[in-house]
Regions:
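Conserved beta-strand in the GNAT
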Residues: 46, 52-61, 65-73
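Conserved active-site tyrosine of GNAT-family acetyltransferases
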Residues: 114
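Conserved acetyl-CoA-binding loop of GNAT-fold acetyltransferases
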Residues: 117-124
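Conserved acetyl-CoA-binding loop-helix of GNAT-fold acetyltransferases
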Residues: 74, 80-93
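Short amphipathic alpha-helix that is part of the acyltransferase structural core
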Residues: 1-29, 125
Length: 132
């Protein structure tokens, strides 16, 4: 199987919802809102196995200095194939002129993945969130 990567936002609401639900992310229950959010994101790189959406990374940026990686996800059927790492490296390359690439890790067990790709834990920072 050959995985193809693209920055074209050519995915449907259903494809996106299926991917997010495959990893049990609640936003997959809101396919239209999720699709709209992705379409309005600074950058989305997706991974495809034929016409099946199997991975995705989403970035928001200020166009000059800082970007934030919001999502990195890969369908469980495709775990262990280096897809997430490839997506992350594509973002690092795209934003190499920026001062900072930040990521909010949803689960601390995933920190080592980012550390393998050169990210450092900021001991003096604490992530916060307001939820409606």
């Amino acid at each position: 199987m050959t995985i193809k990567y693209t920055e074209e936002k050519n995915f449907t609401s259903q494809q996106v919802a299926d991917l997010f639900l495959s990893v049990r992310w609640v936003v997959g229950k809101y396919p239209d809102r999720l699709h709209k959010a992705l379409m309005n994101s600074s950058r989305v790189i997706s991974a495809w196995d034929g016409d099946r959406l199997v991975g995705l990374i989403r970035v928001m940026d200020d166009s000059e200095l800082v970007c934030f990686i919001n999502y990195v996800l890969v369908h469980p059927d495709y775990h262990g194939q280096g897809i997430a790492g490839h997506l992350l490296e594509m973002v690092k390359e795209a934003y190499k002129s920026y001062l900072y690439i930040n990521v909010m890790i949803g689960d601390s067990k995933n920190a080592s993945f980012y550390e393998k790709h050169g990210f450092k834990i900021k001991e003096d920072s604490l992530p916060m969130q307001y939820r409606n």
